[in-house]
């Protein structure tokens, strides 16, 4: 990498973009500083000197949000950054996906890409800057990489597509799309949307790709100028004799028939049996290099299984479980399984099963997101768990990993649009999807299960959502698109394209591929095939429960709203929160007050809510001129008495207004605690109230 500082500039969505090399992190294999508006990201790429054993490419992408980038000090006792937030993990996955397919086949060196956000401008996406930075750090390094790539954010506002919309524009956009790729094709898509059509989504993807081409050309100019020297990578050649023998043995032992079975475990056992028999033919304890031979045999076997699965799909149009390319596995749904949960749904598709459980909470139970942008209160959460038993395995039980965080977020994106607004449904909603069985498409099963749970809970959703995962097998110049892929098709195919939506349109998509990229024709066909599959699944779900239940669970908290004048908020809260805490302690409710004066009152019992409402009404109640009140004597002075019209509001009853005749002392007529009927006669500009008992006596006369 060049050690002399160079700066390259262009425009990106009408904002300045510059890439700097040669000044920072010079001991990394490659490093660039990306400046986009006021956003600054340092991206580095480093590779190990020696390859790792195994048949997996060890790529690690990190995205680090430094709180100083937004002028903030981290919360918590330690006051420093800790484990990455979910949003940072999702961004790291977003960058990983378009980059991973572009390393040479067989490359096994550890590669780590670290993106440090040093300055964050909310209107100049640090995430997209980090994606370009990752591509450039690899491109200017000596690491073999078949890039560059670029990514953009696409919005859809008033029928117009917008590149990298601002925070303000995102609030009114019907689409939040991240698309990435190289000059010739798209290779990553991630989106949340409000029921947009397949055509609108397709146009958005390729609108974004036009900008990607320009950004790739900009990067290529930098690469051509710097002329980085790349480490030559020569894939290890296989032993032709061993490969020929393994191929003959697997064919002889019936690999084709071993693959063709509906049951996942039976298929795995069939393939393992052939593997054991073939490996036994090569075992030689006296050969010191026998372990290497066995490893090569297993690698060849894996490739033969992959090739046979792909051949059957591409040539015979038959899938491992016997389905046609556009056929969905058997479906089964159930709701109301858990009596004490607020809502539950069990969704089964073939050998994939998800149990989604919903909990309703008060508005105060929202999740506070304190990242580099403004604080966000999230009142809808979807969490995804993938226990070991779901695939028949054992292992340690750990905190959610990147995959679980990613699948949970995808489900959240798919369902967020259908969650009713606060004014219509003043609750915090949390759904947990437990994957009980997995043979592919578990994230989409969790979306279907969550829709069932929402309707079972009585949440007035805008429309039910279903999700489906599409696959792809390319062979020579032909391709086959698969509906509802299972685990083997995901692992051995070329694409995992998840599409979720309602009857009217798409609410979320996510696309990962293992080939260089996809053409418009393939994506268009996949979207249409997904639409047909999605409608089939929706129809099945509606046979189980066709609309949200009319009432919430008896065990769900009750939440009611009331509105007060904003200037009365301080009266309800009281000095240092004294008054609101008194209300909570007395009634046992949860209170949430918005700046516009909306108050959410939550409790398990209606009487508790009613009592809290009464107290708040008394506090915020205003005296009216001409209104008559039964007032209580609170304080006596020489010039009159202060009476309480209602809790929190006193009035002055002047000594001259107590009786028709002249009195010398208030105590001659009234004492503390007495009740007297008074009429409000005046409220001055400072809110002070004057009252009269005499006016009522005159009226009686």
Swiss-Prot record:
UniProt keyword Coiled coil present: no
Positions bound to Mg(2+): 490, 496
Keywords, sorted A to Z: Cytoplasm, Magnesium, Metal-binding, Nucleotidyltransferase, RNA-binding, Transferase
Subcellular location per the Swiss-Prot or TrEMBL entry: Cytoplasm
Occurrences of domain KH (ranges): 557-616
UniProt entry tagged with the keyword Iron: no
Catalytic activity annotation: RNA(n+1) + phosphate = RNA(n) + a ribonucleoside 5'-diphosphate
A single cellular component GO annotation: cytosol
MF terms (GO), sorted A to Z: 3'-5'-RNA exonuclease activity; magnesium ion binding; polyribonucleotide nucleotidyltransferase activity; RNA binding
Chief place where the protein resides: cytoplasm
EC nos: 2.7.7.8
InterPro entries associated with the record: ExoRNase_PH_dom1, ExoRNase_PH_dom2, ExoRNase_PH_dom2_sf, KH_dom, KH_dom_type_1, KH_dom_type_1_sf, NA-bd_OB-fold, PNPase
Pfam families reported in the protein's UniProt record: KH_1, PNPase, RNase_PH, RNase_PH_C, S1
Cofactor(s) listed: Mg(2+)
Residues in S1 motif domain copies: 626-694
Role noted for this protein: Involved in mRNA degradation. Catalyzes the phosphorolysis of single-stranded polyribonucleotides processively in the 3'- to 5'-direction.
Protein name from the UniProt record: Polyribonucleotide nucleotidyltransferase
Organism: Staphylococcus carnosus (strain TM300)
High-level lineage: Bacteria, Bacillati, Bacillota, Bacilli, Bacillales
Name of encoding gene: pnp
């Amino acid at each position: 990498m060049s050690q002399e500082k160079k700066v390259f500039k262009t425009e990106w969505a009408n904002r300045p973009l510059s890439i700097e090399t040669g000044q920072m992190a010079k001991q990394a294999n490659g490093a660039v500083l990306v400046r986009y508006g006021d956003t600054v990201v340092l991206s580095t790429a480093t590779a190990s000197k020696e390859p790792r054993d195994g048949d997996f490419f060890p790529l690690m992408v990190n995205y680090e949000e430094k709180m100083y980038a937004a002028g903030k000090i981290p919360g918590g006792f330690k006051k420093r950054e800790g484990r990455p937030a979910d949003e940072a993990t999702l961004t790291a996955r977003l960058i990983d996906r378009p980059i991973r397919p572009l390393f040479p086949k067989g490359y096994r060196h550890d590669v780590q890409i670290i993106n440090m956000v040093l300055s964050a401008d909310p209107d100049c996406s640090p995430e997209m800057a980090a994606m370009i930075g990752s591509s450039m750090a690899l491109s200017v390094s000596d690491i073999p990489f078949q890039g560059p790539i670029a990514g953009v954010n696409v919005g859809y506002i008033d029928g117009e597509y917008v590149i990298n919309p601002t925070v303000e524009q995102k609030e009114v956009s019907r689409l939040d799309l991240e698309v990435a790729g190289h000059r010739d094709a798209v290779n990553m898509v991630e989106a949340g949307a409000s029921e947009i059509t397949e055509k609108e989504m397709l146009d958005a993807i390729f609108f974004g790709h036009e900008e990607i081409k320009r950004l790739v050309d900009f990067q290529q100019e930098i690469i051509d100028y710097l002329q980085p020297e790349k480490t030559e990578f020569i894939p290890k050649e296989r032993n032709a004799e061993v490969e020929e023998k393994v191929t003959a043995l697997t064919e002889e032992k019936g690999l084709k028939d071993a693959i063709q079975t509906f049951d996942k475990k039976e298929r795995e056992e069939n393939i393992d049996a052939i593997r054991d028999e073939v490996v036994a033919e090569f075992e030689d304890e006296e050969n010191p290099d026998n372990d290497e031979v066995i490893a090569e045999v297993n690698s060849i076997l894996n490739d033969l299984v992959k090739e046979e699965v792909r051949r059957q799909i591409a040539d015979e149009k038959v899938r491992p479980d016997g389905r046609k390319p556009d056929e969905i596995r058997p479906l089964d749904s159930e709701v109301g399984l858990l009596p004490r949960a607020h809502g539950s749904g069990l969704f089964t598709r073939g050998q994939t099963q998800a149990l989604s459980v919903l909990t309703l909470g008060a508005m105060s139970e929202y999740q506070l997101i304190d990242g580099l942008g403004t604080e966000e209160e999230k009142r809808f959460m979807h969490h995804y768990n993938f226990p070991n038993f779901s695939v028949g395995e054992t292992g340690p039980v750990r905190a959610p990993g990147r995959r679980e965080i990613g699948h949970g977020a995808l489900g959240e994106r798919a369902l967020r649009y259908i969650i009713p607004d606060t004014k219509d449904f003043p609750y915090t909603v949390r759904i947990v999807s437990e994957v009980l069985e997995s043979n592919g498409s578990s994230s989409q099963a969790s979306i279907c299960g969550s829709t069932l749970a929402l309707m079972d809970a009585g949440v007035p959703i805008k429309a039910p959502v279903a999700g489906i995962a599409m696959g792809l097998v390319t062979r020579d110049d032909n391709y086959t698109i698969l509906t509802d892929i299972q685990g083997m098709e995901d692992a051995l195919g070329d694409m995992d394209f998840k599409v979720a939506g309602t009857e009217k349109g798409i609410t979320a998509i996510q696309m990962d591929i293992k080939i260089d990229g996809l053409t418009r024709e393939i994506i268009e066909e996949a979207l249409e095939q997904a639409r047909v599959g999605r409608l089939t699944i929706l129809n099945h779900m509606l046979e189980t429960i066709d609309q949200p239940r009319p009432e919430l669970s008896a065990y769900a908290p009750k939440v009611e709203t009331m509105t007060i004048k904003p200037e009365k908020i301080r009266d309800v809260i009281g000095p240092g929160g004294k008054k609101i805490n008194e209300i909570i302690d007395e009634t046992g409710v949860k209170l949430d007050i918005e700046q516009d004066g909306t108050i959410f009152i939550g409790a398990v019992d209606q009487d508790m809510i009613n009592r809290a409402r009464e107290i708040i009404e008394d506090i915020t109640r205003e005296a009216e001129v001409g209104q008559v009140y039964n007032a209580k004597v609170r304080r006596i002075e020489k010039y009159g008495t202060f009476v309480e019209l209602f809790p929190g509001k006193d009035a002055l009853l002047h000594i001259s207004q107590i009786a028709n005749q002249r009195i010398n002392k208030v105590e001659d007529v009234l004492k503390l605690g007495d009740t007297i009927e008074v009429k409000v006669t005046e409220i001055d500009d400072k809110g002070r109230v004057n009252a009269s008992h005499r006016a009522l006596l005159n009226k009686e006369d």
